[in-house]
């Protein structure tokens, strides 16, 4: 069987696609996967290094653009649709899966026009406009959070969770805490870092003076901010490992007592799988404010706490950190609730559902020929 996985742009869209690809390829040595993305997305840099096949098309968003840019974007979408039809003809997939991002729409639309089985995966609690539209023309919709269910046709929507990279699932080992031990904090703002989160941590340090000796911080800053953040920790005398990018996230999660992070869908999936208590700082400019809605989904279940960026100060962040340090039972309860929300078999569920749909279609064709 052949599968096209379309989308990307950010790690939040791409990493679930990689998890699905790995599961699909593991099912049969004859299976093939082709990713389709854009040259500006993270997929163009990452997928060739990981050994996956990748085709590039022209696509961009329209939201928030002026009239001229919207016209240009529409032109790119039409060209991307033409490119998508060519890719479908050459690769001849049995299945197409859109995982979000600019490349998702042209491929799924082209698949509909050519009669190819097509699906989408929605990572967030609140879907964007593209997936809301595509949800009406696909054979199946896979959602990560129950809040998204109301936006799609009930008869084709399945709650699967958000697929997690195998290196996170297989490599995670939680450290054993002991009384009087150090307190380890993992800080990251997504695959590219987040300058506002970085600054908030540095601003919080003077308010953590009484516990500085206990703190051990691992901080993913993004490439542009690493030097500034490293100097900030050194000036405050806090032991911190500052990295532009963390390659081994499973080890980083395993060592952490607390995570300070954004609230993208992939982050949510990973921290729940690892059962981590989190202080979420949602990115305020995410489409349709979906990061805030993602975080609220966990906060309402006592599986995390949230500080909106508009309310973010070093003092407020320090107060949250101190509160969780001083109340380990509350942190442990948060971890338990987060772990209960994890869906570790998301990739398997998605692949199984797509394969079953395809088999049903093949049987229908055979029955029609038999008549």
Curated annotation (Swiss-Prot):
Tell me which Gene Ontology terms the entry assigns under biological process: carbohydrate metabolic process; cell division; cell wall organization; lipid glycosylation; peptidoglycan biosynthetic process; regulation of cell shape
Q: How does it sit in the membrane?
A: Peripheral membrane protein
State the HAMAP family in the record. Answer: MurG
E.C. number, please? 2.4.1.227
Q: What is this protein called?
A: UDP-N-acetylglucosamine--N-acetylmuramyl-(pentapeptide) pyrophosphoryl-undecaprenol N-acetylglucosamine transferase
Q: What is its main location?
A: membrane
What enzyme category does the UniProt record give?
transferase
User: Which InterPro entries does its entry note?
Assistant: GlcNAc_MurG, Glyco_trans_28_C, GlycoTrans_28_N
Q: Where in the cell is it found?
A: Cell inner membrane
* Protein role: Cell wall formation. Catalyzes the transfer of a GlcNAc subunit on undecaprenyl-pyrophosphoryl-MurNAc-pentapeptide (lipid intermediate I) to form undecaprenyl-pyrophosphoryl-MurNAc-(pentapeptide)GlcNAc (lipid intermediate II).
Biological source species: Geobacter sp. (strain M21)
On whether Transmembrane is a keyword of this UniProt record, the answer is no
Give the CC-aspect GO terms: plasma membrane
Which pathway does it serve? Cell wall biogenesis; peptidoglycan biosynthesis
**The UniProt record lists the keyword Transmembrane helix:** no
Question: Which residues are noted in the entry as UDP-N-acetyl-alpha-D-glucosamine-binding?
Answer: 10-12, 124, 165, 191, 246, 291
- GO molecular function per UniProt: UDP-N-acetyl-D-glucosamine:N-acetylmuramoyl-L-alanyl-D-glutamyl-meso-2,6-diaminopimelyl-D-alanyl-D-alanine-diphosphoundecaprenol 4-beta-N-acetylglucosaminlytransferase activity; undecaprenyldiphospho-muramoylpentapeptide beta-N-acetylglucosaminyltransferase activity
* Reactions this protein catalyses: di-trans,octa-cis-undecaprenyl diphospho-N-acetyl-alpha-D-muramoyl-L-alanyl-D-glutamyl-meso-2,6-diaminopimeloyl-D-alanyl-D-alanine + UDP-N-acetyl-alpha-D-glucosamine = di-trans,octa-cis-undecaprenyl diphospho-[N-acetyl-alpha-D-glucosaminyl-(1->4)]-N-acetyl-alpha-D-muramoyl-L-alanyl-D-glutamyl-meso-2,6-diaminopimeloyl-D-alanyl-D-alanine + UDP + H(+)
The family this protein is said to belong to: Belongs to the glycosyltransferase 28 family. MurG subfamily.
What Pfam families has UniProt attached to this entry?
Answer: Glyco_tran_28_C, Glyco_transf_28
């Amino acid at each position: 069987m052949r599968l096209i996985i379309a989308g990307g742009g950010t790690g939040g869209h791409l990493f679930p696609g990689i998890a699905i690809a790995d599961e699909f390829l593991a099912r049969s040595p004859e299976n093939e996967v082709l990713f389709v993305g854009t040259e500006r997305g993270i997929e163009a840099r990452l997928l060739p290094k990981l050994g996956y096949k990748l085709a590039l098309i022209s696509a961009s968003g329209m939201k928030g653009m002026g009239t001229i840019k919207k016209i240009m974007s529409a032109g790119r979408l039409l060209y991307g649709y033409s490119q998508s039809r060519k890719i479908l003809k050459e690769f001849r997939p049995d299945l197409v899966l859109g995982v979000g991002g600019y490349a998702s729409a042209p491929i799924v639309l082209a698949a509909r026009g050519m009669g190819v089985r097509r699906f989408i995966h929605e990572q967030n609690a609140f879907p964007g406009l593209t997936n809301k539209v595509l949800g009406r023309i696909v054979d199946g919709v896979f959602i990560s959070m129950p809040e998204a269910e109301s936006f799609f046709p009930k008869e084709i929507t399945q709650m699967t969770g958000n697929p997690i990279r195998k290196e996170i699932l297989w490599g995670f080992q939680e450290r054993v805490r002991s009384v009087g031990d150090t307190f380890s904090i993992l800080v990251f703002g997504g695959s590219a870092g987040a300058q506002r989160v970085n600054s908030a941590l540095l601003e919080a340090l003077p308010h953590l003076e009484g516990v500085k000796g206990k703190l051990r911080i691992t901080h993913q800053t993004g490439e542009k901010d690493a030097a500034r953040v490293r100097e900030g920790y050194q000036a405050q005398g806090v032991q911190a490992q500052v990295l532009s990018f963390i390659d081994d996230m499973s080890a980083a999660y395993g060592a952490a007592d607390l995570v300070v992070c954004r609230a993208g869908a992939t982050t949510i999936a990973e921290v729940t799988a690892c059962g981590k208590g989190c202080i979420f700082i949602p990115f305020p400019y995410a489409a349709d404010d979906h990061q805030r809605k993602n975080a609220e989904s966990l906060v309402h279940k006592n599986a995390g706490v949230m500080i909106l960026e508009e309310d973010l100060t070093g003092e407020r962040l320090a107060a949250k950190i101190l509160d969780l340090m001083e109340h380990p039972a509350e942190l442990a309860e948060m971890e338990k609730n987060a772990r209960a929300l994890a869906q570790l078999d998301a990739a398997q569920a998605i692949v199984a559902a797509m394969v079953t749909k395809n088999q049903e279609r093949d049987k229908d064709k055979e029955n029609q020929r038999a008549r």
